Swiss-Prot record:
Protein name as annotated: tRNA-specific 2-thiouridylase MnmA
E.C. no: 2.8.1.13
Keyword Transferase: yes
CDD domains per the UniProt record, alphabetical: MnmA_TRMU-like
Length: 361
């Protein structure tokens, strides 16, 4: 009997090819798109760039018709609002810089979507992520590994996956490059073969976080820039418009290159300093998830990434109380940012990760 798999289809080339590959491999494939966001007028996003626009549903439906697979649309707007949007806004209001894609993967795609899939009789879910899942019989655990195409690897945003999620998820694209995926799309005669990748956060198509937060919260009071001694340097926009390490768009001249070194939301202050002030060699992370084991019992050596685009750096992670770890880097890291995720690797294996609570100088 064929195993049933529900593919999360965004209307893009990756998830479309994932569905085509699984059908070719003999699975009983179903497709579904999660409608997760609408604008303040109650209308679906209409920008063609967004993975949750009305065009995304149209493109996904066209692909499903070509592949001759059943197709569903799940209304998950309320869940997305409560779980992702509110979290995103709350973190910025706290003076932190969140990664909403990680929260969406953790709570929407691999938790709620998986629950829906199991409820309608599916054996697995699948997505178009570039990552590899393998079962290690010696550990009796599923492992998450980097994709073959290192430049497309998406394991950074998947470190929160549990053993249950990994056991029920398929990543058909893990062993392909992006060019190979586009060629497969042409082979399968899919209309999205040349569709560009989405770049922005899906619910902020213009990439203007500050404008979005102001509109959602009504908080618009200007703040002040101060130096590391507390001296006022000038007027700033509301503090939530800034992130640690930022230099562009400050709109202030001090005669020196200045960077955001700290954010004080309770005082509506943005602390500026010279570049040396944004380097640190340690951090504390919380809200941890480990994949090859349940809990870190002793200090281990890893490589670590402090943001999606960062280079990995050698580090030690040391267990602390209250589900926290101390991460000690061998070299100072630029702009360690509270709210972002730090993800740990052992060669190609994802060890786990957590949310950065604070940097330690």
């Amino acid at each position: 009997m064929k195993k049933k798999v529900l593919v999360a289809m965004s209307g893009g080339v990756d998830s479309s090819v994932a569905a085509a590959i699984l059908k070719e491999e003999g699975y009983e494939v179903y497709g579904a798109t999660m409608q997760i966001w609408q604008n303040e007028c109650g209308e679906e996003l209409i920008t063609g760039k967004s993975c949750c626009s009305i065009y995304a549903v149209d493109d996904a439906r066209k692909v499903a018709n070509i592949l001759d697979i059943p197709y569903y649309v799940f209304n998950m707007k309320d869940d997305f609002r409560k779980i992702v949007i509110d979290y995103f806004i709350d973190e910025y209001i706290k003076g932190r810089t969140p990664n909403p894609c990680i929260m969406c993967n953790r709570k929407i795609k691999f938790e709620l979507f998986l629950k829906k899939a199991i409820a309608i009789g599916m054996d697995y879910i699948a997505t178009g992520h570039y990552a590899i899942i393998e079962y290690d019989s010696s550990l009796n655990r599923y492992l998450l590994k980097r994709s073959k195409a290192k430049e497309k690897d998406q394991t950074y945003v998947l470190y929160n996956m549990t053993q249950e999620m990994l056991s029920k998820t398929l990543f058909p694209l893990g062993r392909f490059s992006k060019d190979e995926v586009r060629k497969l799309a042409e082979k399968f005669k899919l209309p999205v073969a040349k569709k560009p990748d989405s770049q922005e956060i899906c619910f902020i198509p213009d990439n203007n976080y500050g404008k979005f937060i102001e509109k959602e919260t009504g908080i618009r009071e200007d703040g002040v820039y101060v130096d590391t001694e507390g001296n006022i340097l000038g007027k700033s926009k509301a503090y939530y418009n800034y992130t640690i390490g930022q230099r562009k768009g400050l709109g202030i001249s001090t005669g020196k290159r200045m960077y955001v070194v700290a954010i004080k939301p309770e005082e509506n202050k943005v602390v500026l300093g010279e570049e040396g002030k944004i380097f640190a060699d340690a951090l504390i992370a919380t809200d941890l998830n480990f994949i090859p084991f349940d809990k870190l019992e002793s200090e281990i050596e890893v490589t670590a990434k402090i943001r999606y685009t960062a280079k990995e750096a050698k580090a030690k992670i040391v267990p602390m109380e209250n589900n926290k770890v101390l991460v000690k880097f061998y070299e100072k890291q630029r702009a360690i940012t509270p709210g972002q995720s730090v993800v740990f690797y052992n060669n190609d294996i994802v060890v786990g990760g957590g949310i950065i609570e604070k940097a330690l100088v």
